[in-house]
Curated annotation (Swiss-Prot):
It catalyses: oxaloacetate + ATP = phosphoenolpyruvate + ADP + CO2. Involved in the gluconeogenesis. Catalyzes the conversion of oxaloacetate (OAA) to phosphoenolpyruvate (PEP) through direct phosphoryl transfer between the nucleoside triphosphate and OAA. Its cofactor is Mn(2+). It is found in: Cytoplasm. GO terms for biological process: gluconeogenesis. PROSITE patterns: PEPCK_ATP (PS00532). GO terms for molecular function: ATP binding; metal ion binding; phosphoenolpyruvate carboxykinase (ATP) activity. This is Phosphoenolpyruvate carboxykinase (ATP).
Length: 541
């Protein structure tokens, strides 16, 4: 076996990972090497990379254009039995498997990767050396190696020389599981984790995000048990060193609002909060590109150049990209190293404690105020609720709101009971003297969405502290404290009741939404912490 490396780091032994007969190992190859490897003329199918006019390579991930939550499994053993938030305890994707089934799945992956020419990427998940995971990703596909080189934190040559993995990811995308029915699994595809062995294995799916989000789920297990908040949020820092974090589900404005020319980006998706402050888990960004334009999102557009990797976009014959084409998927993506963004914090990916915590929601019911200041109990309640809503059009042009509740604004990646994340977050906030705000970027009684100008004015008022000087009143039913006036924000929208010609209309919609909140929160009342928070939510007399 030969080991090609861009450093003189010690050779690595893959037999300890169950891989034998490996013909060649390309360990942490340069971007230049990866570009050559992923665009080789002989490559076919999903291995083939296409060079676009922007200089970045584009790949197709086949039918898997997003994560496969129904194919996610975790070994239930002495390590996880009493700590994991299992699928039978709540509506989640943490489905248990036995060590016997794990051994069979792992055998499929090690057989697939043995005897092959392999790419090995060693990187870090977490910018804090004290708590980061040293992750080794093993794959036979060049662009998958490129993806994780972009997304994980890249070690220095000195760090590589002594690198020992805490966690190993083996991606056997080309193999599937023929015995899935007999094993009681969902399909022939699998994304499985063993916390005792500290290994993730992948079979059947080519989607790059499984590797990134897999390690996020593991950080979500390991960090809160040490009292460190693990968060699905974006983060930025102002000129005075003031840090803000933005939680929000897809479509609420998390990326748009945290990308601010007046503030430096810490990261766009996954962060921790420890005794030193906020830190990014990642070394790159994974941005949606559907309907991307240079005018609307110049930072992301300009990041798409050599070393960026596009997924599932339509590339025309001349190499130009049709970002408006969602025929493969609406979830078209690009990964790129974080240094492709100009306005990033230095040193990269770390800053002090957060002073402002912003929960973004897009309320399509037209009930919630555009901004509310939350008490610590309300902070936990709304963090656990993780509410947003979308408008789905019907054939007669009527629009019906569809609510989504996702605990901690990232339920798909939680591995402990949601109340544990809320407790750790609020403890960190209280120690730092941080304030929390609920910001609604959705609709009101006018039937229109709250303007981006008003929302930006609200965010500015939160960040500069002027919102805390404003006079306030309390909105009934939800008991939310709202300002009467804010600089650069239309005062007529601050109380949502004022946006309706008939205030009774707001009341009937508010009752409907309050009931949905109450019914959703019922699942968290299986422990004392959850029960104690019911009073912080909406109240119906």
């Amino acid at each position: 076996m030969t080991v090609m490396e861009h450093t003189k780091a010690a050779q690595i032994d893959l037999t300890k990972h169950g891989l034998t007969g490996v013909t060649e190992v390309l360990r942490n190859p340069s971007y230049e090497q990866l570009f050559v490897e992923e665009t080789l003329p002989g490559l076919e199918g999903y291995e083939k990379g296409v060079v676009t006019e922007l200089g970045s390579v584009a790949v197709d991930t086949g039918i898997f254009t997003g994560r496969s939550p129904k194919d996610k499994y975790i070994v239930k053993d002495d390590t996880t039995r009493d700590t994991m938030w299992w699928s039978d305890q709540g509506k989640n994707d943490n489905k248990p498997i036995t060590t016997e089934v794990w051994d069979e799945l792992k055998e499929l992956v090690t057989t697939q990767l043995s005897g092959k020419r392999l790419f090995v990427i060693d990187g870090y998940c977490g910018a804090n050396p004290d708590t980061r995971l040293s992750v080794r990703i093993i794959t036979e596909v060049a662009w998958q190696a490129h993806f994780v080189k972009n997304m994980f934190i890249r070690p220095t040559d000195e760090e590589l020389a002594t690198f020992e993995p805490d966690f190993v990811v083996m991606n056997g995308a080309k193999t599937t599981n023929p015995n899935w029915e007999k094993q009681g699994l969902n399909s022939e595809n699998f994304v499985a984790f063993n916390l005792t062995e500290r290994v993730q294995i992948i079979g059947g799916t080519w989607y790059g995000g499984e590797m990134k989000k897999g390690m996020f789920a593991m950080m979500n297990y390991l960090l809160p048990l040490q009292g460190i908040a693990s968060m699905h949020c974006s983060a930025n820092v102002g000129e005075e060193g003031d840090v803000a974090i933005f939680f929000g589900l897809s479509g609420t404005g998390k990326t748009t609002l945290s990308t601010d020319p007046k503030r430096e980006l810490i990261g766009d998706d996954e962060h921790g909060w420890d005794d030193d402050g906020i830190f990014n888990f990642e070394g790159g960004c994974y941005a949606k590109t559907i309907r991307l334009s240079k005018e609307a999102e110049p930072e992301i557009y300009n990041a798409i150049r050599r070393d960026a990797l596009l997924e599932n976009v339509t590339v025309r014959g001349d190499g130009s990209i049709d970002f408006d084409d969602g025929s493969k998927t609406e979830n078209t993506r690009v990964s790129y190293p974080i240094h492709h963004i100009d306005n990033i914090v230095k040193p990269v990916s770390k800053a002090g404690h957060a002073q402002k915590v912003i929960f973004l929601t897009a309320d399509a019911f037209g009930v919630l105020p555009p901004v509310s200041k939350l008490t610590p109990e309300q902070t936990k309640y709304h963090f656990l609720s993780g509410f947003t809503a979308k408008l789905a059009g019907t054939e007669r042009g009527i629009t019906e709101p569809t609510p989504t509740f996702s605990a901690a604004f990232g339920a798909a990646f939680l591995t402990l009971h949601p109340t544990q994340y809320a407790e750790v977050l609020v403890k960190r906030m209280e120690a730092a003297g941080a304030e929390a705000y609920l910001v609604n970027t959705g609709w009101n009684g006018t039937g229109k969405r709250i303007s981006i100008q008003d929302t930006r004015g609200i965010i500015d008022a939160i960040l500069d502290g002027s919102i805390d000087q404003a006079e306030t009143k309390v909105i009934p039913m939800f008991n939310l404290e709202v300002p009467l006036a804010l600089h650069d924000v239309d005062p007529a929208i601050l109380d949502p009741r004022d946006t309706y010609t008939d205030p009774l209309q707001w009341e009937s919609k508010a009752k409907d939404l309050a009931e949905r909140f109450i019914n959703n929160f019922d699942k968290y009342t299986d422990n004392a912490e959850g029960k104690s928070l019911v009073a912080a939510g909406p109240q119906l007399d």
